[in-house]
Amino acid sequence: MTNLRKTHPLMKIINHSFIDLPAPSNISAWWNFGSLLGICLMIQILTGLFLAMHYTSDTMTAFSSVAHICRDVNYGWLIRNLHANGASMFFMCLFLHVGRGIYYGSYLYKETWNIGVVLLLTAMATAFVGYVLPWGQMSFWGATVITNLLSAIPYIGTTLAEWIWGGFSVDKATLTRFFAFHFILPFIITALVIVHLLFLHGTGSNNPSGINPDSDKIPFHPYYTIKDALGLMFLLLILLSLALFSPDLLGDPDNFSPANPLSTPPHIKPEWYFLFAYAILRSIPNKLGGVLALLASILILLIIPFLHTANQRSMMFRPVSQTLFWILAANLITLTWIGGQPVEQPFIIIGQLASMLYFLLILVLMPFAGLFENYMLKPKW
C-alpha cells in the first residue's frame, strides 16, 4: 500500500511543503524566522478572533469593551496581552527575516522577495488599523496624524483623507471601517503567505554560503522541524514572559486614557515597530517630502535586488559589505530610538543624519562595496 501522505491530493501538498521538502544541509538558525512568522500569524488570528467576539467598534463603547475583555471575560486579559505583544513578536521576527534576506542575498529570488515586501506592507497596515481599535488617546491621535498624511498628496489629498475617515475627522465611521480592515487583512496576509511559499518552493531555499545547494539536500522533516521547534520554544518563552510579567512594557501609557479629540497628548508616537519610519517621516520639514521619504523607506526594499553588484550572492565572505550591513542595523536602531523622542535638539539633527545615512547606505555605499570587493578578488598578476 502506498503512503497516504504521498498520494492523497491534499496531504501531498503538505508533504511536499513541510515533510519531504529538500532543504539545504547548512541553513542556520536565521532560517527559523519564516516558520516563526507563520506561528505568530496563527497566534494573532486566533487571539484576534476571540477578542473580536467581545469587542464593539463604536466610539462610545470601544474603550469600555476592551476594559470589559480584560476584567470580565475568562482569560480575556491573557488573550489581549498575547495579541498586543504577539504583534511585537511578529514585527521582531519580520525585521530579522528581512535582515537575513539582505545579508545572505535571498532577495535575488525576486518573486519571493517582492511578495515578501507586499506582506511587510500589509502587516504594517494591519498593525496600524489594529492600534486604533482600543480607542485610547494614542489610538485616536495616531490615527489622526497618520491618516492626515494623505492630505499631503497634491490635488486629491484632502478628498482622499475625508474618504478614508468617512467624515471630516477621525470618528465613529473611521473606527468601524478600521475594525473591518483589521479583521479581513490577516486573511489576505495568509493568502499572500501561501503565494510567498509557492514562489520559494519553486526555487528552493537559499543558504548561508550563497552557492547552489542542489548537490547536498536533506529532508525538511525531521531535521528542520526539530530545529524550528527549538526556535518556537524561544519565541513562546519571550512572548509569554512579556504577556505575563510586563504586558504594558512596549505600549504607551497615553492609551490607558479614553480618546479625547479636545486634548492632544504631548508626544504622539506609534508603536515601537513603526518608530524607524516615523523618524524618517519627521526628519523632513516638508509634509509631502516626509510622506515620500516614509514610503521610500519601505519601498526601497523592492529595488535592493537591482542594486546587487557583487559576484558573490551572500555577505558571508564579504567583510566590507558585512561592516556596512551592521552599520545599517545600528542606524535602524538609532532611528527607532529617535522616533520615540520629542521633536527638539539634538534629536532633530540625529534623526536627519540617520535618515540620510539609511538611504545612502542602501542606494550608494552597499552597491559600491560590492564593486570594490569584486575588484579586490580579481588576480592582480
Curated annotation (Swiss-Prot):
Binding site for a ubiquinone: 201
Keywords: Electron transport, Heme, Iron, Membrane, Metal-binding, Mitochondrion, Mitochondrion inner membrane, Respiratory chain, Transmembrane, Transmembrane helix, Transport, Ubiquinone
UniProt lineage: Eukaryota, Metazoa, Chordata, Craniata, Vertebrata
Cofactor(s) demanded: heme b
Subunit annotation: The cytochrome bc1 complex contains 11 subunits: 3 respiratory subunits (MT-CYB, CYC1 and UQCRFS1), 2 core proteins (UQCRC1 and UQCRC2) and 6 low-molecular weight proteins (UQCRH/QCR6, UQCRB/QCR7, UQCRQ/QCR8, UQCR10/QCR9, UQCR11/QCR10 and a cleavage product of UQCRFS1). This cytochrome bc1 complex then forms a dimer.
PROSITE patterns, per database record: CYTB_CTER, CYTB_NTER
Gene, per the UniProt record: MT-CYB
Annotated cofactor note: Binds 2 heme b groups non-covalently.
CDD domains xref list: cytochrome_b_C (cd00290), Cytochrome_b_N (cd00284)
Chief subcellular location: mitochondrion
Protein family: Belongs to the cytochrome b family.
Residues reported to bind heme b b566: 97, 196
The protein's name: Cytochrome b
